[in-house]
């Protein structure tokens, strides 16, 4: 199912193109980090599950485009997904095929990966609980 069809079918706010929705991938350190972030989000959102929190392939409805366009604190990161889930935003996932990187190098070397995970965990477990919510946001 494609992302547009899923958004129309479910009336959700965000559709994530997931690498792991229906397909298993070989376990590596990146996947372990992604799963740890998935569990952190589940803990802080009352069990809401997003299987591929680090996927950058996302489709936003008009309301979400407006929110991301006007709020500088919205970034395409897992902690923002946790915040949005706690605000009542509906997020769905569909399986997509993504190819491995064929050129360039990731900025997430070992040191940067540790730093990234620390920032995400701090934000998900601490900062999101004190973050000011906009009018209409839940919780």
Question: Residue ranges of each PLM-predicted region?
Answer:
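Catalytic donor-sugar/metal-binding loop of nucleotide-sugar-dependent glycosyltransferases
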Residues: 48-49, 71-72, 82-99
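Negatively charged linear elements and acidic catalytic determinants
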Residues: 123-127
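Acceptor/aglycone-binding surface of glycosyltransferases and processive sugar-polymer synthases
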Residues: 1-74, 101-111, 115-118, 122, ...
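Cell-envelope/extracellular polymer assembly enzymes that use nucleotide-activated donors
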Residues: 79
